[in-house]
């Protein structure tokens, strides 16, 4: 992957401009920062970690170590180094780590090693909050277990239940599922039982509970055998997650690789740019030209804006694809596949893409719309600068976003610099972007009409189990 393009960061206070371009002075973000030039880096984790070990040092057998090498895993990540030796001790485990920390291999490797020792069908079950994450976890299991011909089945909503029943009838070693569809099969698929299950993993447990899967998890836990090993992985330890671990784990060991709730990695270059709201599109196009040839995720707040920006960028010749919860399952998987393969290098997304998705090679994150909370900001920018690589995150701050931005900086524990660019260079693009905006408006009308037709056809009502494993954004 090419190195992220280096940019100079402005030390001067940003000049605010109103939508009306008036000459009256405005209070700047930098003036509220007070001593921006002397701002210190955010708090570091108080824990000191030893030098990374090899997977063999952790107790992983040679066959699986070779699979790790094939996948490009040079050394264990902190969560892997802490979790794997404990998981191999046949103990329940709670792992607290942020997105992009390598949690999947932290539970997949011990399960595969145990499977090699005592092969059987329905050996492990992994519960995930979203369909995309379920498919990615399955792919990781299959890649790491390729030398032992591990069989995985993905059981998620939005897919044909009959074909899933056939897949379960082939007795896979590992099932990766969303809770709603798994419970459907446990209740309705003849001959399907998990009474011999040995391992249960609840990945992104905080997200599972945020998406109201709690009652479904309770039902599933009552069906599963008590004599099993359970791994719970989460980015945070909320009261809901605490309750879940008490109900599902037996005398667990706990691993945490970060003591700072809002910590970001040191290889991530974060900045903001104050932008008049009406000029956001122009600045976005300018920055994409600055980072041409590099992969980028553009985060927006709504489905409508995600689609509009995708249409806008396509009209300008960019390879942009949307990702949000109102797309069909096949469209969402297709979008992720194109972005991973780099046939498209720009992903325009709601927060459906902020957590859990396996997109390892993102160079730039652009917060077109600021998130309303600091935790979501950290999850978004965590899509870049992963596994020791460098990355860039730039946030657009309009005259309406100043208070939100100051709250985010407060949570980070540091003041960020303004991204340096020349306004005159940006505004050269105004006419061209304006034409693309008009074209995008026409395409949005067609999109909204089709969406309205579907809404009338299917009606509105309480979410089904199938819909629950689809992100809201």
Curated annotation (Swiss-Prot):
Highest taxon of source: Eukaryota
Motif (DEAD box): 203-206
Domain (Helicase C-terminal) ranges: 283-427
Reactions performed catalytically: ATP + H2O = ADP + phosphate + H(+)
Protein location: Nucleus
Entry function: ATP-dependent rRNA helicase required for pre-ribosomal RNA processing. Involved in the maturation of the 35S-pre-rRNA and to its cleavage to mature 18S rRNA.
Matches recorded under PANTHER family: ATP-DEPENDENT RNA HELICASE RHLE-RELATED, RNA HELICASE
Family the UniProt entry places it in: Belongs to the DEAD box helicase family. DDX47/RRP3 subfamily.
Official protein name in the record: ATP-dependent rRNA helicase rrp3
Gene name linked to the record: rrp3
